[in-house]
Regions:
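Short, Lys/Arg-rich, polar N-terminal cytosolic tail immediately upstream
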Residues: 1-18
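Alpha-helical transmembrane segments of multi-pass integral membrane proteins
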Residues: 11, 18-24, 33-40, 50, ...
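C-terminal ends of transmembrane helices
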Residues: 12, 60, 98-106, 203-210
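Hydrophobic transmembrane alpha-helices
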Residues: 20-74, 80-81
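Structural signature of hydrophobic alpha-helical transmembrane segments
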Residues: 38-52, 80-94, 187-195
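Membrane-interface helix-loop-helix junctions at boundaries between adjacent transmembrane segments
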Residues: 59, 72-146
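Generic multipass alpha-helical transmembrane bundles of integral membrane proteins
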Residues: 120-121, 129-241, 253
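Short, highly charged, low-complexity non-transmembrane loops/tails of multi-pass membrane proteins
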Residues: 270-327
Length: 336
C-alpha cells in the first residue's frame, strides 16, 4: 500500500514537471490504439490502413482537442464503411451526426468515452468501463457509454457479416438501408449490454458518493456483482442468448474490479482510522460534518553525493615532520 502511494506521488511529480510533453503523448498513444482497433475490425479502405497514414494521423491528433479527435475517428469509420457499402456508411454518418448534435456538442469532455469502449472491448476488459465511469464521472455519462457500445456493436456486426452486407441487392436505397438496420439492431446482446452498463454506472456512482467508510471499494465490489448478475440474469431469467461465457464474464469482471481498485488507490486514498465528526452552526443551519483526512506521502528525495577520491587522499594524508639527517649536527657557538 505504502509503495503504491509513494509511486503515485512520484508519478504526480513527474507529470507536473513534464505535463507539456506527456499530454500530447498520451493523446497520440490513445489515438494510435483506436486507429489500430478500427483498422483491425473494419479495415476495408486500404489507404487508411497504411502505417504511414496511421502514424501521421496519430501525431496530428496529439495537438488537437478531444472533440476533434472523436470527429476524426468517426470519419475514419465512415470511410471504411463506405469502401464496403455506401448505404452502411450513410447509416453510420447519420448516427454520428445525431450523437454530436444531441449530446457531444454540449458535453465535449465525454467524447473520449465514445472510443474508450471499443478499445476496452478489443483488450478484453469491457467491464472496466462502467465501473470507472461510475467512479470518475456522473450518470450523465451513460449516454457516452451507450454510444460507445453502439459503435462497438456496429463494427462487430460489419466485421462478422461483411459478405452478407455485400450480397444485399435491392432496387431502392431505402430498402437496402432498412435491411442493414434490421440486421444491426435486432441483436439483443446490444440492448442487454447497454442496460447492464447503465445500471452498473448508477449503482457505482450512488455508492461512492455515500458518506460511509470505504465507499469507493464498496461501490467497486457491488458494481462488479451487479455486472455479473445482470448478464447472467438476462440469459437465465429472460432466456436471452448473450453469447457470453460465464467463466470469461467472471474473469473479466474480476480484472475490471482490480483495475478499478488500483484507480481508487491512486485517486481517492484516505485514512478512515483518523475520521473526525464535527458539528458547528450559524444563524440558519446546524452542520454535521464528517472529515476524513487524505493519505499524503512525500515522494522520497534521492540525493547523490559525489566523492573526489584525490581530494580525500590529500585531506587524509598527513605530512610527516622532517627528521635531521644522520651525520650532521648543528654547531652552537658560545662566547665567553
Amino acid at each position: 500500500m505504502m509503495m503504491i502511494l509513494s509511486f503515485k506521488e512520484r508519478l504526480k511529480q513527474f507529470y507536473s514537471n513534464f505535463e507539456f510533453y506527456l499530454k500530447p503523448l498520451f493523446k497520440i498513444l490513445c489515438t494510435f490504439i483506436a486507429f489500430c482497433v478500427i483498422n483491425h475490425k473494419i479495415g476495408y479502405m486500404t489507404m487508411l490502413t497504411q502505417p504511414t497514414v496511421v502514424g501521421v494521423a496519430s501525431i496530428m491528433c496529439g495537438v488537437l482537442p478531444c472533440s476533434l479527435i472523436v470527429v476524426i475517428l468517426s470519419l475514419i469509420i465512415v470511410g471504411h464503411l463506405y469502401a464496403l457499402n455506401m448505404e452502411l456508411a450513410i447509416i453510420a454518418l447519420i448516427l454520428f451526426v445525431l450523437m454530436y448534435l444531441l449530446y457531444f456538442k454540449f458535453t465535449p469532455k465525454d467524447g473520449f468515452v465514445l472510443f474508450m469502449v471499443p478499445i476496452a472491448f478489443a483488450l478484453n476488459i469491457p467491464y472496466v468501463v462502467p465501473i470507472l465511469v461510475g467512479l470518475a464521472l456522473t450518470p450523465v455519462s451513460i449516454v457516452s457509454v451507450a454510444f460507445g457500445v453502439l459503435v462497438e456493436k456496429m463494427m462487430d456486426y460489419v466485421s462478422n457479416n461483411a459478405v452478407t452486407i455485400n450480397s444485399v441487392s435491392s432496387d431502392s436505397i431505402l430498402k437496402r438501408m432498412n435491411i442493414l438496420l434490421n440486421g444491426m439492431f435486432t441483436d439483443k446482446t446490444f440492448y442487454i449490454t447497454m442496460i447492464v452498463f447503465a445500471v452498473v454506472i448508477i449503482v457505482v456512482y450512488i455508492l461512492r458518493t455515500r458518506s460511509v467508510d470505504h465507499a469507493w471499494m464498496v461501490a467497486i465490489i457491488v458494481g462488479a456483482i451487479c455486472n455479473v448478475a445482470g448478464f447472467i440474469g438476462a440469459e437465465v431469467v429472460l432466456s436471452i442468448n448473450t453469447d457470453i461465457e460465464t467463466s470469461s464474464l467472471v474473469i473479466q469482471t474480476v480484472i475490471a474490479a482490480l483495475i478499478a481498485a488500483v484507480f481508487n488507490i491512486c485517486v481517492f486514498s484516505v485514512d478512515y482510522s483518523r475520521t473526525e465528526h464535527l458539528q458547528f452552526e450559524d444563524d440558519e443551519y446546524v452542520y454535521y460534518v464528517k472529515a476524513v483526512p487524505k493519505i499524503n506521502i512525500a515522494a522520497p528525495e534521492v540525493s547523490v553525493k559525489r566523492i573526489n577520491t584525490r581530494r580525500m587522499k590529500n585531506v587524509t594524508k598527513k605530512k610527516e615532520p622532517a627528521r635531521p639527517q644522520a651525520g650532521k649536527r648543528k654547531r652552537v657557538s658560545r662566547e665567553d
